[in-house]
């Protein structure tokens, strides 16, 4: 009889199992991913402020011949987040990886979030986000445009409604000035599209030189009709560029438009902060969650010498956010190129996506979307409507 060599007589079973894995490393032992998965669950994402376990973000962890593969799911647009997150996770998981290569794949799962209790979400629009300011001149419209562009660039389906009826600027900023939207059925308006975003504005429907002398009720009626009669299609986010101020028009719009969250734009100076606080309180009054505060024109850096100067003061947005228990979503620079790009019809995120100022907008947008992702979801479309009839 031929000789038969039994490896089990030479080495213990566990050692044998490991040896076989090395000999034929097509797959690793089934539990090899467990230490990585357990450690990964405890990672606190800086945008969510939650562990990946709390966010239910870990879809799968597997270990193969070529290394480890981690698949994550986020409730916010994350098309360009992997490049930022991968080196951080490699360092965080270094002991568990044991020197093997780490691959990371991300996907977005953007859901609808709750709106005011007295309102129903807009059909086919998952989330409406209002961008507001207590006063004009703080860069609200520029921030709204770049917010919409940043979400679209990160993979979301985005619309932009210019509700600043007395000074509609989005047609110019989005490069759509002079273009009129069309209708296919005589009832609904097809929005214009620019830079990957669906855009609608009262500015498309009136002459650019025509002053708006409407009273409050006419304004709110026109805007709610514009919102409802536009064929937005399927959107993850609809950004509403609100009129500046905290008067009757703004309050009525906040009561009639089903908003998932609001963003307050201010500059660091005390006068702007006084009005921004009024805007924040207005949204609280109508039960709209404030996602956070954006401090615009935070710092100016001289293009000639590089000198940094806080022209409008410093830290005002952070102090306001801390005072009211909301997030500081970002500190945006005062840069002449931001103004030039907006005036030219191509806001910063589209005009110069690799610049530091565009990065500031993208990070602000991700913080806002991540904050929204942590809030209560809307389940009205999941559960059937129950009607109780008296007998």
Task: Give, region by region, the residue ranges found by the protein language model.
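N-proximal, solvent-exposed amphipathic alpha-helical segments enriched in charged/polar residues
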Residues: 26-59
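Short edge beta-strands and adjacent turn/loop segments
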Residues: 49-70, 332
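C-terminal boundary of histidine-terminating zinc-finger modules
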Residues: 345-354
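Conserved catalytic-core segment of NTP-binding enzymes
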Residues: 87, 232, 236-237, 243-344
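Phosphate-binding/switch loop-helix module in NTP-utilizing enzymes
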Residues: 206-253
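Extreme N-terminal, non-catalytic leader segments
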Residues: 54-57, 64, 74-75, 81-130, ...
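Walker A/P-loop phosphate-binding motif and the immediately C-terminal alpha-helix
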Residues: 128-165, 185, 280
């Amino acid at each position: 009889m031929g000789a038969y060599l039994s490896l089990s007589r030479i080495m213990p079973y566990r050692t044998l199992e490991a040896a076989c894995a090395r000999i034929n490393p097509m797959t690793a032992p089934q539990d090899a991913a467990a230490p990585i998965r357990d450690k990964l669950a405890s990672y606190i994402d800086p945008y969510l402020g939650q562990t990946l376990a709390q966010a239910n973000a870990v879809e799968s962890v597997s270990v193969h011949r070529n290394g480890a593969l981690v698949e994550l799911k986020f409730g916010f647009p994350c098309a360009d987040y992997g490049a930022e997150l991968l080196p951080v996770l490699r360092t965080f998981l270094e002991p568990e990886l044991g020197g093997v290569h780490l691959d990371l794949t991300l996907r977005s799962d953007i859901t609808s979030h709750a709106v005011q209790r007295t309102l129903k979400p807009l059909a086919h629009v998952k989330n409406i986000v209002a961008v507001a300011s207590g006063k004009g001149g703080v860069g609200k419209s520029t921030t709204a445009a770049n917010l919409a562009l940043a979400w679209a660039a990160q993979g979301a389906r985005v619309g932009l409604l210019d509700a600043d009826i007395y000074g509609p600027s989005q047609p110019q900023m989005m490069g759509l000035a002079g273009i009129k939207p069309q209708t296919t059925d005589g009832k609904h308006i097809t929005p214009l599209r620019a830079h990957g975003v669906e855009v609608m504005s009262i500015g498309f429907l009136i002459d650019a030189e025509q002053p708006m002398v409407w009273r409050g009720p006419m304004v709110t009626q026109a805007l709610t009709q514009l919102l409802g009669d536009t064929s937005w299609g399927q959107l993850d986010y609809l950004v509403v560029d609100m009129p500046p101020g905290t008067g009757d028009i703004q309050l009525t719009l906040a009561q009639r438009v089903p908003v998932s969250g609001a963003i307050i734009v201010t500059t660091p100076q005390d006068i702007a902060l006084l009005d921004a606080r009024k805007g924040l309180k207005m949204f609280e009054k109508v039960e709209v969650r404030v996602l956070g505060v954006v401090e615009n024109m935070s710092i100016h850096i001289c293009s000639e010498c590089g000198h940094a100067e806080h022209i409008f003061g410093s830290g005002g947005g952070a102090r306001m956010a801390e005072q009211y228990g909301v997030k500081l979503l970002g500190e945006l620079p005062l840069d002449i190129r931001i103004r030039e790009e907006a005036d030219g019809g191509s806001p910063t995120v589209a005009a110069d996506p690799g610049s530091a100022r565009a990065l500031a907008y993208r990070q602000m947008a991700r913080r806002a979307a991540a904050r929204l992702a942590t809030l209560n979801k809307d389940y009205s479309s999941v559960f059937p409507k129950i009607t109780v009839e008296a007998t």
